[in-house]
């Protein structure tokens, strides 16, 4: 029996300004969000010392999906739509991506240091 191994890549606590929100005070100015992304990808049987970079995935791809790949001129009514966009970006960019988890914390509504937000988990087909 062959095990199905996955490599888990993570980028945590990226602070990003995104047009999001449903309240009038949120709809015209970008809101500060803290985004963390975890992606599970198919991996080779082994990573030997001379394994090429292409056998893995760059964590920069996760950072890109949560920052520069987010459209600056689009208003996301819900932060769930922001998470969906991050997931879609990673699934489209690499067929090896099997699962994406996106955690988003809305920094502007924290009153006592608490984390208020969502976590979305998507699996490829």
Language model features with spans:
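N-terminal, polar/charged subdomain of small-to-medium soluble alpha/beta proteins
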Residues: 1-125
